[in-house]
Amino acid sequence: MKKFFVLAIGALMLAGCGTTGLEGGSSSSDGKVDEKKPSELTVGVSVSTLNNPFFVSLRDGIQKLADENDTTIKVVDAQDDTAKQSNDIDDLIQQNVDVILVNPVDSSAIVPAVEAANNADIPVIAIDRSSDGGELLTTVASNNEEGGKMAAEYIIKQLGENAKVAELEGVPGASATRERGKGFDDYAEGKLDVVDKQSANFDRAKGLTVMENILQAHSDLQGVFAQNDEMALGAAEAASSKGEDFVIVGFDGTEDGLKAIKDGKISATIAQKPEEMGKLALQAAFDHFSGKKVEEKIDSPLDLVTE
């Protein structure tokens, strides 16, 4: 049986996927809204990449709630390309969608696209990663800083203080990369010896290559925090000769990541719930168009999974 250590319950619970009110408000939801039923909405969805199981699950969560409410969904895959994502969002604006749900490739590069949607009076909801500018109706995400701290706490518990560890970082510029790294680094300072940190772009193959290079430079390395499960799986392949005392912690809780924990390939993951995250984002859009106020930040649950 998996051991789940619950960090927090989401600010919004989906009861039968019905429309649930969100308390509080953001500037986008304070003005008068042309109310629409879910079945009358056309929702644009821009995902950073569908070549990652986490974001496939996020897309599926949106699609499931949309199907239950007869909502039209237009999904575009940015393929981890910031220019393509901006063009995709421009296309969605031209198609006069009612709302855009965006999972940014890069939190800075997405700003002009968010501002373009603002200028077209199309509300924007960010998922998993935020935008560094423009006006958002809300951001639906886990507490990434707290998740990074949880990873550091777990590694210290397993290896003790002053253990030599490395970090595999995500896409440079993504808010999740910054926040997970900050949470880990702040807690690890003075407690762990972080000998190296390099970006592997949230990618499994790059995680393998980067981890091989780190191990060549630091043969006495004792563990690694990878900012997502894909990189953790690459790191596990590179460190397969290190044995079970080598600690690998991922982030996301993907199907492949959870299986790797069962198989003893990685030690733990900070598990998000991407399908629920997608549902929460679409539910926020439903609430907005029913005239309800929407929180500026909606938290999605986060757990530490160790077996």
How should each PLM-predicted stretch be described?
Residues 39-41, 168, 172-176, 187-188, ...:
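Hinge/cleft segment of the Venus flytrap/periplasmic-binding protein
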